[in-house]
Swiss-Prot record:
Name of the protein described by the UniProt record: Uridine kinase
Domain of life: Bacteria
Record-listed ATP binding positions: 12-19
InterPro entries linked to this entry: P-loop_NTPase, PRK/URK, Uridine_kinase, Uridine_kinase-like
Catalytic activity: uridine + ATP = UMP + ADP + H(+); cytidine + ATP = CMP + ADP + H(+)
Family: Belongs to the uridine kinase family.
Tagged with keyword Transferase: yes
Gene that this polypeptide is encoded by: udk
Origin organism lineage: Bacteria, Bacillati, Chloroflexota, Chloroflexia, Chloroflexales
Amino acid sequence: MSTYPIIIGVAGGSASGKTSVAQAILQRVGADRIAHIDHDRYYKDLSHLPLEERAKFNFDHPDALDNDLLVAHLDALCAGQSVDLPTYDYATYVRLPQTERIEPRPVILVEGILIFYEPVLRRRMQIKLFVDTDADLRFIRRLRRDIVERGRSVESVIEQYLATVRPMHLEFVEPTKRYADVIFPGGGRNPIAIDMVVARIEAALQATP
């Protein structure tokens, strides 16, 4: 398989700081050179279920995500084709008709909690980063995010964390740390590690014909 574009994976637990690391890379390497994809966009549509059942769905299990579509999109971008990213509504748990078109770029950056779990995704990545953050800090960040950005109640966030987020992290996310080329401790606030990753990306871009 061609190594162009360069595919970078940023994994880690929920609210670990993956997006902060991704944004740092985007700023340093240049957003015009990176196609940025969030794995959360690929949650399966639950519109066929009653809203009450959707709210109880285990979104932290690998089966909750449409990885076939993500793989197809990655392969299309690598083939020089534009793709239409799905849009997911976290308040109603459905895939919306609106999409976001992204064009091929020299770098594809994929972030998500489970992107290292699936071998079919992992094999496509040349650089794999894992953001390692204390569980208490991740929970606080998730609580704030889900209330402010996703319209969730405190009770629903806590219930979901205890029922699925924490156990699924221990079963499916934490073990994938071993696949990482670089581990970011402390929530990704590590400028030295960012410098190393950016230097590696730039070197790979220069070496690509």
